[in-house]
Amino acid sequence: MGAEGAVRGARPVPVRAQRVPKYYRLKRHLLDMTDTLPPGTPVPPERTLAAEFDTSRTTVPQALQELVVEGRLERIQGKGTFVAKPKVSQALQLTSYTEDMRAQGLEPTSQLLDIGYVTADDTLAGLLDISTGGRVLRIERLRLASGEPMAIETTHLSAKRFPALRRSLVKYTSLYTALAEVYDVRLAEAEETIETSLATPREAGLLGTDVGLPMLMLSRHSVDGQGEPVEWVRSVYRGDRYKFVARLKRGTD
């Protein structure tokens, strides 16, 4: 039986009118405002918004906070709330952070937060195809775009496969360039997982966001042309400033 036959003669389900909360009407007004005003435009004070929409002062922060979380507004401590810049859009492909930012017309820079050796647990050993307890070079960097913090990136590589890599990075500003020129290793394929997380106090401090703000957490496992593991990377991106875009194509099967 087709879908039309399955519902023939059925009574339509009545749709009950829903009362629109005042904070939601305010939120829609602010959304329309962000579409017409340039980034950096200040939002009217909470008292003004409460009076204009005939709502309590406690209702206004709810609408503002939701728009901050969604990346439409930006709250600057001690200054107020402003229309946010458009989110940085990144296609899901096997490219470096530097390439991604330059494609957006932004200037990529990095700050080294930590570099050192750690011992591989069972999970990390499996990802890098080394023995449990093996040495792993761990590189943690703060990624910026035109001076604005965007992500915290933590890279793990086998110390056995890439001996003296830590010294090589003194000469090379790009990790992938060092891997290619010193070890003749290039990334060929990767599996990437995207999840959500909430900003920890440390992450919020480094990225300049509020504690508990939604983040985009990426895990990337990259291999070379022979299928040998190269790196495992965990990155935390600002959910209010970043979005990922995937181009999908229907299979031929």
From Swiss-Prot:
Residues 16-86 form the HTH gntR-type domain. InterPro entries: Bact_HTH_transcr_reg, Chorismate_lyase_/UTRA_dom_sf, Tscrpt_reg_HTH_GntR, UTRA, WH-like_DNA-bd_sf, WH_DNA-bd_sf. SMART domains: HTH_GNTR (SM00345), UTRA (SM00866). Pfam families: GntR (PF00392), UTRA (PF07702). One of its GO terms (molecular function) is DNA-binding transcription factor activity. The keyword Membrane does not apply. It is found in: Cytoplasm. Residues 46-65 bind DNA. SUPFAM superfamilies: Chorismate lyase-like (SSF64288), Winged helix' DNA-binding domain (SSF46785). Keywords: Cytoplasm, DNA-binding, Repressor, Transcription, Transcription regulation. One of its GO terms (biological process) is negative regulation of DNA-templated transcription. One of its GO terms (cellular component) is cytoplasm. Gene3D superfamilies: Chorismate lyase-like (3.40.1410.10), Winged helix-like DNA-binding domain superfamily/Winged helix DNA-binding domain (1.10.10.10). Induction: Actively expressed during vegetative growth. Global regulator that is part of the nutrient-sensing system. In the absence of glucosamine 6-P (GlcN6P), represses the phosphotransferase system (PTS) specific for the uptake of N-acetylglucosamine (PTSNag), and genes involved in the metabolism of chitin, as well as several genes involved in development, thereby linking carbon availability to morphogenesis. Regulates the dasABC transport operon involved in glucose-related morphogenesis. Essential for development. This is HTH-type transcriptional repressor DasR. It comes from Streptomyces griseus.
